[in-house]
Amino acid sequence: LFGLCLYFVIMAKGKKLISLKYWKYCLPLALPIILHLLSGLVLGQSDRVMLQSMSGNYEAGIYSFAYTIASVLSLLWSATNNAWVPWYYENTKANNTKGINQLAKKYILLFSLGTCTIMLMTPEVMKILGPEEYWSAGRVIAMVVFGIYFNFLYTFAVNYEFYSQNTRWIAVGSICAAAVNVGLNLLLIPKFGGMGAAVATLISYFALFVFHNIIAARLGGFNISKRLYLYGISIVSVGFTVINLTYDFPVLRWIIILLLGFGLIYFNRKVIEEQLKRYLKKDKTQ
C-alpha cells in the first residue's frame, strides 16, 4: 500500500506517463534479466519438482532436506557477494586489475575453506536436524554443496557482465545452464534418484560457471585471473574427496575440520586483530 502511494506521488511529479527515451534504455537491459532470473529459478527448483514426479514424495523429501542444509552456503555466498560487488565495480572502473585479483584470491581461498568445512560437517548436522530415515542424504549434501560452490564462482563473471551492461548474453548463458539441468534430470533421476538429481545440480552449476566465463571473456576486459578458479576448485575438490573417504570416520573428519578452522583464523588474523583493537579501544573509552 505504501509502495502504491509512492508510485502515484512519483507519477504525479513526473507529469509524464511514458518516456520513450527511458523505455528504450531500460527494456533492452531489463528483459534479458527477467529470462536470466527465470532460468535461475528453473536451475534451482527443477530437480526437486522432477524428482517428486519421477521418484515420489519420499525421495523428494530426503533430497529437499539435503538441499536445505546445503543452501547454508548460498546464504554465505549472497552476503559476501553483496559486499564484493560495489568494491569490484569501483575498482574495475579505476582499472585496478592487480588489486582486484589480490583480493579475489583471498576471497576465493576463504570461501573455498568455508565450503570444505561445511562439507565435512554435514553428517553430524544432518543427524542433529533430521530423523534417522533422512541420514542417507549425507553424500547428496556434499554433491549439492560442490554445485553451489560453482554458483559462487560464476558470480565473478556475471558481475562483470552486469558491469558491462550486456544483459542479452547473461540470459543466454543462464538459459543454456537451465536446459542442461532439465536434460540431466530427465536422464539421471530415473536411474539414480536423489543422487542423480545431485549430480545433475553439480554439472549444471559447473556449466553455468563455464558459460558465463566464456561470455565474459568474449566481451573483453574481464579482469579475474583463471588461475584463481583452478586454485579454489582444487581446494574444494580435495575437500569433496576427503568427505567421501572419511564419511564413516567422524574423529578423523573433525580433526580436519579443526585444522580448517585454524586455517580460516590464520588467514583472517589481520582482520581479527583489527576488530579486537577496535573493540578494546571502544571499551576503554566507555
Give the role of each language-model region:
Residues I243-Q286:
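Membrane-proximal transmembrane or re-entrant/amphipathic helices at the cytosolic face
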Residues F2-L6, W77-T80, N101-N151, V182-K191:
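Alpha-helical transmembrane segments of multi-pass membrane transport and lipid-handling proteins
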Residues A70-K105, V158-Y163:
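Helix-loop junctions and terminal segments of transmembrane helices
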Residues Y25-L29, I33, L51-S71, W135-R139:
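Interfacial/gating helices of multi-pass transporter permease domains
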